Amino acid sequence: MRRAALWLWLCALALSLQPALPQIVATNLPPEDQDGSGDDSDNFSGSGAGALQDITLSQQTPSTWKDTQLLTAIPTSPEPTGLEATAASTSTLPAGEGPKEGEAVVLPEVEPGLTAREQEATPRPRETTQLPTTHLASTTTATTAQEPATSHPHRDMQPGHHETSTPAGPSQADLHTPHTEDGGPSATERAAEDGASSQLPAAEGSGEQDFTFETSGENTAVVAVEPDRRNQSPVDQGATGASQGLLDRKEVLGGVIAGGLVGLIFAVCLVGFMLYRMKKKDEGSYSLEEPKQANGGAYQKPTKQEEFYA
């Protein structure tokens, strides 16, 4: 359990301090089987480390200034931890890249603490500690070869090494490369071969300008055509809408006129019927009264009263 806790602690340090502590990353990687499977590729990277070291020794002064600037800007991004002081002390070593042998010496100094703890826990881990030390020796060369391959090819204008280093490096190295690439363009512009570097940005800038001009021209052309289409389309739509509106209005007017005429006719008929009814009623009143008088004549008292005397 204690050993697993130590492995987890080392992995956490590796993830939190990737750009600042490549040595700790190297010590954390060998226990994992991934670096063990890549020992063969580490040998190739170790063979190429010598050539990279010769190139970097020829240009130590610009690389140290740029590395110190990058390292001072990068440690601020990770979370504040108690090991930042050690990160600052160890970050100066990869800046020069000359004291890589000293870095290899620092690794065994850190490991003996772990080996001592393991020896206190169990006597057998001595054999297991010897095996990781051999792997660490190989992985240190691998990491030192990968780091310059990722950082310096940008400064020395060697794209070949950069292409081989980016896929070969693990996920942690890939996370570390963006910081170096961010500072890479400034380093290449200030490094040697200013003519090549000036041609590249000039071509890129001209291409970008061409793209921007083309897009702006297309946009202006589209904008110039769209207003015409928009101006023409409303006229067509207005004409069609006006014709449709007139047709609709004619129909509406026809319907209104027909309705008005029907209403007038109905009103006239109603008024005539009412007048006829009134007249009929007047005439009917006399006709009705006459039969009443005839019927009532039998019952009516005689107008002439004849008095009969007995």
Curated annotation (Swiss-Prot):
Residues 32-42 have a biased composition (Acidic residues). Shedding is enhanced by a number of factors such as heparanase, thrombin or EGF. Also by stress and wound healing. PMA-mediated shedding is inhibited by TIMP3. Keywords: Glycoprotein, Heparan sulfate, Membrane, Phosphoprotein, Proteoglycan, Secreted, Signal, Transmembrane, Transmembrane helix. Residues 27-100, 114-212, 284-310 are annotated as: Disordered. The keyword Transmembrane applies. One of its GO terms (cellular component) is cell surface. Residues 23-254 are extracellular. It comes from the Eukaryota. The keyword Cell division does not apply. Glycans are attached at S37, N43, S45, S47, S206, S216. Interacts with CDCP1. Interacts (via C-terminus) with TIAM1 (via PDZ domain). Interacts with MDK. Cell surface proteoglycan that contains both heparan sulfate and chondroitin sulfate and that links the cytoskeleton to the interstitial matrix. Regulates exosome biogenesis in concert with SDCBP and PDCD6IP. Able to induce its own expression in dental mesenchymal cells and also in the neighboring dental epithelial cells via an MSX1-mediated pathway. Belongs to the syndecan proteoglycan family. This is Syndecan-1. It comes from Homo sapiens.
